[in-house]
């Protein structure tokens, strides 16, 4: 485990107490919802996830973001147990008197038992990133590389990965072309057989959303989708996409099948191109550059970009930052573990690597 400002150790007694507080809160709430779903579209590597929560919108969020099992799979597969459990008691504040707790909210991860507990925050993105972090710990042991990236498939059957922090363009660029099908917009795995999307849905930023520029996202905001951290125009009751009074990190969650140009099941062959999306607001990097293996290794490890409001980093104004692997906050292992795997796969499959500056 790579301990740092994002991965903070806590003693087993405190972790057990935090989990018990969440379980007790859920058990004594008026409503308790349980959502079962798969993470990972490749059936050889998918895992079963079970979420316990008290808010309907959290349940719908996980129903959107996980891969929905069939009735037969629910009966025959999930009845045998699950691989990951999430206890979301986000409405309950946590006491700083518990040893190891440093804030009034906590996301506590028990890797040995694959359980995540959430207290003190109702941000739905915590659940999907909990699954991502657990898989980023276990998948590399199976030689599966986890990437904070979107993935697309073109008409010729070749795939492209776009790695980047939140708000650098992974979702927007992945959905922009009618000639490319979206495989996933945020969490991609690269195996010995090809690539697959971890998620069953999209979690897209909607700040300043324009129907003419991003029609796919706009048209996916309908019955069954979720809009989070947004306000409404008082007269028309339509969404005010330009309001940042709550946070710039306003988002929508919807299942992949809401998109007309999606590749389902969300799997594909080994990528032909990998694009590092860098929102360089200082003008240091060129608009486009092709990288050799050493440059790709350095750029992936340094993760130079700008802080933009998102699930991993939030800021009211852009500022330069470095985030290893374009998602350091999600990495349980040392960044070189993922960087070494990436370069090995790039060399093995003769992949082109590009840097694109979206700043």
Spans of model-derived segments:
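Short alpha-helical segments and helix-capping/turn motifs at coil-helix boundaries
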Residues: 15-24, 68-72, 102-103, 251-263, ...
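Charged, amphipathic alpha-helical linker segments immediately N-terminal to NTP-binding catalytic cores
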Residues: 79-141
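Glycine-rich, often acidic-flanked micro-motifs
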Residues: 140, 148-150, 154-165, 175-179, ...
